[in-house]
Amino acid sequence: MAIANKNIIFVAGLGGIGLDTSREIVKSGPKNLVILDRIDNPTAIAELKAINPKVTVTFYPYDVTVPVAETTKLLKTIFAQLKTVDLLINGAGILDDHQIERTIAVNFTGTVNTTTAIMEFWDKRKGGPGGVIANICSVTGFNAIYQVPVYSASKAAALSFTNSLARLAPITGVTAYSINPGITRTPLVHRFNSWLDVEPRVGELLLEHPTQTTLECAQNFVKAIEANKNGAIWQLDLGQLIAVEWTKHWDSHI
């Protein structure tokens, strides 16, 4: 999907990977970039507007843990202004296995709820035009960082949800793919809590191995958006974009 002249909603578009991705997106010339984030960052919004003044960049405060009804209300406001939305990026995430309930609420339930809410506007069974969803998951959804099992499990759940969305596209008209970054040098991984403090140095240990920058990840993210492949499982690791071939071990046959 060419980004030029598209309307894009980016949940958590002001974080580490999120902000660099927002920068790369505005360079590609969408018509509108709507950023939904828990924390306002006027400086970042001003920077995005300055990168490409032809792009309309707007911000709405948003916490992905709110009920679906509240998200739907916010989306009604956005759709009323834009008329159409082409792409939803679900990017909210936390890495802190001390916060078990919040990790699941942000990393998994929030993605499900935001997706559920936008279906009210996109689902072709309701007369909607369809749309595209890019869910930011993680390579830990493939193989866990076992010292942070709650985080890893939440990302595996988000990946499974995304794979199902892609299979449902013939019914809903909404396509989906997952973005799975490897270890990326962001504040998220510099220091974080392992589950039950099983490894207090887990963040430091990860950074002793090869990593990637947020810019490298963001540039490959834009390439994945442009590829627009329904059901794709994109691995963004060490500056490379790799299409993962998922191994099927079981099938429901329905």
Curated annotation (Swiss-Prot):
GO terms for molecular function: alcohol dehydrogenase (NAD+) activity. The active site is at 151 (proton acceptor). It holds the Pfam family adh_short. Substrate binds at residue 138. GO terms for biological process: alcohol metabolic process. GO terms for cellular component: cytoplasm. NAD(+) binds at residues 10-33. It catalyses: a primary alcohol + NAD(+) = an aldehyde + NADH + H(+); a secondary alcohol + NAD(+) = a ketone + NADH + H(+). Keywords: NAD, Oxidoreductase. Its EC number is 1.1.1.1. Homodimer. Belongs to the short-chain dehydrogenases/reductases (SDR) family. This is Alcohol dehydrogenase. It comes from Drosophila flavomontana (Fruit fly). The lineage of its organism: Eukaryota, Metazoa, Ecdysozoa, Arthropoda, Hexapoda. The gene is Adh.
